[in-house]
Amino acid sequence: MNNMNVIIADDHPIVLFGIRKSLEQIEWVNVVGEFEDSTALINNLPKLDAHVLITDLSMPGDKYGDGITLIKYIKRHFPSLSIIVLTMNNNPAILSAVLDLDIEGIVLKQGAPTDLPKALAALQKGKKFTPESVSRLLEKISAGGYGDKRLSPKESEVLRLFAEGFLVTEIAKKLNRSIKTISSQKKSAMMKLGVENDIALLNYLSSVTLSPTDKE
């Protein structure tokens, strides 16, 4: 791959602007599209000659959803498109499930400014990229004794939305699954993580994210 055509997707215009300005400093990168929701992204993908999609994990879009659901749809319908996830979500269980989707990289928005250019440079060489900030988080969940109890992508998606404040009924509607299915996936995830109630689950999700000292 010589010049790299990139699409950016994020529901915050200022983030789109910042990413584009950052990528404009890389002479071999061309930004060929910017989208603020998943529906616009999917509708325009067939029209664009893109090599890489840089997408937020949490992004509105009624028809195609976001997160793991969106990534799986894109990989199924646009298999040649490389995907780099850019996210504020630093929960290791969720990040691990996203990486299990065989994406090309994941970058934290609160990570080093050089992480995204490094991810693209690695991709240009045919390699995947996991920044140190993400590697530290994945080590954290292993240290907590949950390394052999990996969440499924569907379980991780339910926990991501639960951590964002969605109720089980709202998650069911958003993911187009039954309330019974969502409840079962949430319960299964809680059993794997060794937590018995919602408060303990929220405490766990909070405890395994980066603390201020982790960011130094």
From Swiss-Prot:
Phosphorylated and activated by RcsD. Residues 5-124 form the Response regulatory domain. CDD domains: LuxR_C_like (cd06170), REC_NarL-like (cd17535). PROSITE patterns: HTH_LUXR_1, HTH_LUXR_2, RESPONSE_REGULATORY. The keyword Phosphoprotein applies. Interacts with RcsD and RcsA. Pfam families: GerE, Response_reg. The keyword Transcription applies. Component of the Rcs signaling system, which controls transcription of numerous genes. RcsB is the response regulator that binds to regulatory DNA regions. Can function both in an RcsA-dependent or RcsA-independent manner. Keywords: DNA-binding, Phosphoprotein, Transcription, Transcription regulation, Two-component regulatory system. GO terms for biological process: phosphorelay signal transduction system; regulation of DNA-templated transcription. Residues 144-209 form the HTH luxR-type domain. This is Transcriptional regulatory protein RcsB. Residues 168-187 bind DNA. Gene3D superfamilies: 3.40.50.2300, Winged helix-like DNA-binding domain superfamily/Winged helix DNA-binding domain. Belongs to the RcsB family. The modification 4-aspartylphosphate is found at D56. It comes from the Bacteria. It comes from Salmonella typhimurium (strain LT2 / SGSC1412 / ATCC 700720). One of its GO terms (molecular function) is DNA binding.
